[in-house]
Swiss-Prot record:
Alphabetical list of PROSITE patterns matching this protein: NITROGENASE_1_1 (PS00699), NITROGENASE_1_2 (PS00090)
Organism of derivation: Azotobacter vinelandii
Reaction it catalyzes: N2 + 8 reduced [2Fe-2S]-[ferredoxin] + 16 ATP + 16 H2O = H2 + 8 oxidized [2Fe-2S]-[ferredoxin] + 2 NH4(+) + 16 ADP + 16 phosphate + 6 H(+)
Pfam family, one: DUF3364
Keyword annotations of the record: ATP-binding, Iron, Iron-sulfur, Metal-binding, Nitrogen fixation, Nucleotide-binding, Oxidoreductase
Protein name in the entry: Nitrogenase molybdenum-iron protein beta chain
UniProt entry tagged with the keyword Transport: no
Amino acid sequence: MSQQVDKIKASYPLFLDQDYKDMLAKKRDGFEEKYPQDKIDEVFQWTTTKEYQELNFQREALTVNPAKACQPLGAVLCALGFEKTMPYVHGSQGCVAYFRSYFNRHFREPVSCVSDSMTEDAAVFGGQQNMKDGLQNCKATYKPDMIAVSTTCMAEVIGDDLNAFINNSKKEGFIPDEFPVPFAHTPSFVGSHVTGWDNMFEGIARYFTLKSMDDKVVGSNKKINIVPGFETYLGNFRVIKRMLSEMGVGYSLLSDPEEVLDTPADGQFRMYAGGTTQEEMKDAPNALNTVLLQPWHLEKTKKFVEGTWKHEVPKLNIPMGLDWTDEFLMKVSEISGQPIPASLTKERGRLVDMMTDSHTWLHGKRFALWGDPDFVMGLVKFLLELGCEPVHILCHNGNKRWKKAVDAILAASPYGKNATVYIGKDLWHLRSLVFTDKPDFMIGNSYGKFIQRDTLHKGKEFEVPLIRIGFPIFDRHHLHRSTTLGYEGAMQILTTLVNSILERLDEETRGMQATDYNHDLVR
């Protein structure tokens, strides 16, 4: 082969060498039984048509490229946000390998999580013995202060009872009776990763507070509880902390994985780092109130907080963009009695200045976007504030109430009149939409790059560039440290959007003596 020790080539140029071209051609001709290229081209072109879109949208029992993940993924992220807590998945090793690699690739960090290795025998006879041995081994080997248990499809299909299994493990001495093992049933065949986060948080809150409410007094600790929900931008944890600190507000961030998912390379491995303490969780009912940063996917959490903690959860939206950050800060000020400081007022003014500076480039630009319910709703709201036009809005794990709420936001703005909201649809549906009604850009996670590739394959004039905002981001580095919440997050989103537009304009206008009449130095 053409790889030389003294001149190592990366995979992309290497596979362009003639040796590899010949090898791949022989593989195709000898083993792949490939269809004729003209037939492949014909089918590709057909999949870009309105006729195919109509057939595509009639799918009922098939998902192609889902824009969501399964419940235990969210449960693992929630558990990682608590101090010295080991996420424990009652299921097979393969599932946990998937969760860990998913987070590894997004955060570029080692992610600790264990399973109790259920196999065929456990699927038939139940996984109680796996649970007993697994809890014992986990505690002895990794020495956590808490083990947070969730489930996979296998355990849910056969009906394993986590409460009974954990109690039996304690009764038989596999783990001490006082050792905290909160749990949540997280069946992958309903809901999504955001549902799993909600279920796990409710399970942890229930474990630490349900039976100890007698001495709790709402407001006695003078703090505000902040529940982030399924959040994968580490900068968002930091910006919320910063804004509350600048206001002088006492707070408890309930599930805070910021440190464990961003540990330094200083020669010391940290299996555990930072996180919400058990004492903070036990004290949470004494707070002035509880604010949910992503209320659309925290339904069980809200029900528990209102029903058990007796907190009147304020009706807020995710603090993205200008208006909803205003509402968040004003509500925090109202609850805490602390004024909004001049530093945040100045920060708001800078955002408004940036919006004014860039509005001529953003105005009227058409976007397709997808992601989780709260994120998509917040992004739609901010796009409208910028004068952009969201046209294809897809949320695979959204529900009818969410769609109705987004439709109302769109109806309140002149820039939302051409938008359509899709729930329960996947990225193959979105692919059809961007072919038949082309937007200027897509906003979403890394999986959108294949849609961009397909649109480019049809022709340069059909290409829809991807702007990477969302989860997961596998093919770019360090974006997970960015911010999307607060005024700071709005500034970062605005900067990303307008510079993507200008980069695209430069790309289209750098043709020498052809299009470079608009290849301007100043934009």
